[in-house]
């Protein structure tokens, strides 16, 4: 009887079919779908062909009557009424690991300069993480050497401190950031280039950052021509 009960539980918990939804409306920057069953922040794929090879990644951001409201992460070109929608059942995550160093990723963590399958990334990390408890934050007390004497000597930066660099175009903001990335005592740099032009990205990586800085950096690219929904997601 115990074996029969175990088999029954296996059958009861098994998944024997998959529910899909269909795109019903595209309104502004959002897509409305009839089904599938979903909850807020679930990651969904909107397929652009019957073979379900090409798809647009999207996130459940709300509900309206019997519709699911989706916010796409990619360009919505090709999305139309009737496109199949599949729910992955989990929120958006990004692959992380030491082999990500020296590479560039897009606004939602996809590797852009090689095939992600060639990298041995340790785990998946959710992008929606609760903020740390204010009382658990360390007090800023240690100096973070940035390797630029004028900054280290006159406007010393502490570990964990936020700073802003404000200046007009072409006066050296990117050059200064590149100097920080190459010379800082930090083990890893995460550099987000948001709203940059394509040529400016290559100039920063090759000239300002250089091979030495890039070797211990991960560069997040959110170029000026990307779809609007992706940009605020990355900035947040």
Predicted feature locations:
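N-terminal accessory targeting/assembly segments
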Residues: 1-103, 107-112
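The Walker A (P-loop) glycine that initiates the GxxxxGKT/S ATP-binding motif of P-loop NTPases
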Residues: 167-168
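Conserved lysine of the Walker
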Residues: 173
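Conserved P-loop
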Residues: 176-215
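Single conserved hydrophobic/aromatic residue that forms the stacking wall/gate
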Residues: 224-236
């Amino acid at each position: 009887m115990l074996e029969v009960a175990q088999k029954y539980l296996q059958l009861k918990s098994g998944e024997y079919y998959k529910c899909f939804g269909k795109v019903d409306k595209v309104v502004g920057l959002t897509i409305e779908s009839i089904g599938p069953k979903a909850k807020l922040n679930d990651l969904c794929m909107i397929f652009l062909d019957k073979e379900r090879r090409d798809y647009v990644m999207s996130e459940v951001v709300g509900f309206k009557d019997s519709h699911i409201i989706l916010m796409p992460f990619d360009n919505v070109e090709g999305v139309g009424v009737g496109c199949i929608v599949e729910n992955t059942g989990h929120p958006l995550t990004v692959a992380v690991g030491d082999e990500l160093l020296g590479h560039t990723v897009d606004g939602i963590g996809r590797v852009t300069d090689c095939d992600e399958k060639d990298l041995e990334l340790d785990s998946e990390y959710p992008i929606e993480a609760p903020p740390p408890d204010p009382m658990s934050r360390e007090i800023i007390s240690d100096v973070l050497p940035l390797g630029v004497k004028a900054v280290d000597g006159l406007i010393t930066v502490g570990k964990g401190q936020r700073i802003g660099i404000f200046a007009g175009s072409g006066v050296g903001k990117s050059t200064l950031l590149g100097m920080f990335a190459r010379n800082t005592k930090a083990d890893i740099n995460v550099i987000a280039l948001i709203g940059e032009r394509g040529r400016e990205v290559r100039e920063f990586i090759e000239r300002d950052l250089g091979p030495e800085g890039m070797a211990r950096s991960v560069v997040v690219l959110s170029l000026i021509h990307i779809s609007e929904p992706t940009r605020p997601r990355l900035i947040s």
